[in-house]
Amino acid sequence: MSYRKRIPAKVLFLICAIIGAVCFVGIYGFCILDPSNTGWLFDNDHDLRQHYIGWCHFRTTPWHFPIGLIDTLSYPNSMSVIYTDSIPLFAVIFKIISPFLPQIFQYFGIFGLISFMLMGGFSGILLRRFIDSDICCIAGSVFYVISAPVIQRMFYHTALGAQFIVIIAMVLWVYNDVIDSDVKRTVYWGLLGFVCVGIHSYFLPMAAMFLLAVVFTQLVKGKHYVRSFLPFISFCAAGLLNLYILGAFYGGTSAEGYGLGTFGSNLNTFINPWEIGSILPRLPLQNDFQYEGMAYLGAGILMLFVIVAIGMVFRMVRKVPEESFHSDRIYGRVTIVLALVSFAIAVFPNISYNDIKIVWFPLPQIISRPMSIFRSNGRLIWPAMYILMTCAISFTAYTFRHTKIGIAVIFSALIFQIADMTPAFAGRYAVYTSEHPIKTVWDEGEPAEFVSGQKEFIFLYTDNDITMQTAYYGYLHGMRQNNYYFARDIEDKITGTIKLYNAELAGGNLRDGAVYILRMKDYEKDREFYDDLDADMLKSFDHVMLKAVGSGQ
């Protein structure tokens, strides 16, 4: 395609990035960009609290190797900041300068802004590969910035809102022939592998789909065998290196998770607005956890597909000769395969449409075990979704390539897309521009007096009912604890330490500076045992707290 009389790619990137920033502020407001504004993080979704509190305890953990370990949330078991989804790359950067930062500090708002800007910039560059009109590229980039999965994930599973990583992988794929050296190609993919882990490891398989497409096309075109695989080697090596540096393998933590098939994608995912769209009717899911595979294209993109389909029929009936859309057909064929692979991985093994389970394929262990590393396989639908989005915008521009109608159509579709999602935007704006005071169960009255001057919380059970707010109070007052909610289950380890604590209690030994916490129902089961301990006791908020007599004084 011709690239004459076009603005420079860097300028296009900057314009689209600025538009991304405008979209971010329009949806979330300015308040969350204040690093000292943390109430919205705590007084919101359970997972968002996990991310923020993980950062809080990570910054106070002394440096040691691996550098990503947190010592004070599951003491004596250290866990990686990877498993609190605290955006490890940002966590490490800000921990370096932590001595110069105030105690109340968050980087999640800034991360969201940067993500929106990069999403805008790189999507504009992606569309530039297929569309001659810079205006269409700029307008088209907004579809990516406000894509349903981005809006769904941002400030929920915040790290997963950084879907610009998928777009970067697509850019490296479609511009593969433009990259003029194997060294650059290898370095780019290596950096991407490193960044994937530094933000969220689920981006590894998504980016890898496009990387394998690069390797395949290199081989088909007769490129040198070893040099064709260098990007793949660098990507894997960089990803594994960062996992090791951040402590993903520390202490024998299993990367596998339970629930493969439960967290998949529904066959209705591209047309189901879930809670993001408002124009189309919301469709049921086979189970509530299929929200993980939400990939709603939006009313505007679906409109573009209808227009493109009508245009294709019109050209066939009128026998209008086709012009080459891309210089090499292999890209189109591989792109179709990529979309199908992404879709298949996301919907297997639980194939369902709406609330009907069509079939559940039993998977052999040799397949299920590695797939369990990415148990929320529904997320892997995003490459397919962005491929479809790119096709809708690019084919629309191609259909009207000799007129300015394409610009009008894309802008009309964008307005339709924004109208479809406006209620979701408005709801988020209201939440994130409001004040959210932080309050824990330990802040006032008898609980505050009871824990004053203590050094650690010891939970005598494995549930996560008050672990979050306890961890936040502990951060502010220099206290550690033995139980926390992580992205990977370490209940066996926590149970093991609880047995040791119970053995100490059975011997009449209470640790100085420790506050023991048990649920009221557990206390009632063995009331005589706990009452006979030489301990101070407090009963509050359906829990019982114990500490050694005179502890902390």
Can you describe what each PLM-predicted range is?
Residues 45-49, 57, 238-312:
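Periplasmic/ER-lumenal interhelical loops and adjacent helix-loop junctions
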